[in-house]
Amino acid sequence: MARIAGINIPDKKHAVIALTSIYGIGRTTALDICAKTGVSAAVKISELSEKQIEELREQVAKYTVEGDLRREVTLNIKRLMDIGTYRGLRHRRGLPVRGQRTKTNARTRKGPRKPIKK
């Protein structure tokens, strides 16, 4: 297994799909990385040479991925909560942040139903 950005990339998958196993890299970014390195998107990771894998590593290193990206997102949410914005309050209360209705639905965000105590 090739190791890129601290993640074991699956050998049996095509390069584009394998790169998406890194947090912060989706299909579009993976296609861009493959295009910049000259690696065909259809080739499997196991068929790549060590030089090509090193080029992929260098390209991925230019993006904010994995731990750094997770930390950045967490700090952004924490900042919203600290300055008291509406979005921050919704995060703090565990409710939908982007304007979805909460009278019905929103169960994923609110969690399981709590019985009404009489």
Curated annotation (Swiss-Prot):
Belongs to the universal ribosomal protein uS13 family. Transmembrane segments: none annotated. One of its GO terms (molecular function) is structural constituent of ribosome. InterPro entries: Rbsml_uS13_C, Ribosomal_uS13, Ribosomal_uS13-like_H2TH, Ribosomal_uS13_bac-type, Ribosomal_uS13_CS. The keyword Ribonucleoprotein applies. One of its GO terms (biological process) is translation. Keywords: Ribonucleoprotein, Ribosomal protein, RNA-binding, rRNA-binding, tRNA-binding. GO terms for cellular component: cytosol; small ribosomal subunit. This is Small ribosomal subunit protein uS13. Part of the 30S ribosomal subunit. Forms a loose heterodimer with protein S19. Forms two bridges to the 50S subunit in the 70S ribosome. Located at the top of the head of the 30S subunit, it contacts several helices of the 16S rRNA. In the 70S ribosome it contacts the 23S rRNA (bridge B1a) and protein L5 of the 50S subunit (bridge B1b), connecting the 2 subunits; these bridges are implicated in subunit movement. Contacts the tRNAs in the A and P-sites. Residues 91-118 are annotated as: Disordered.
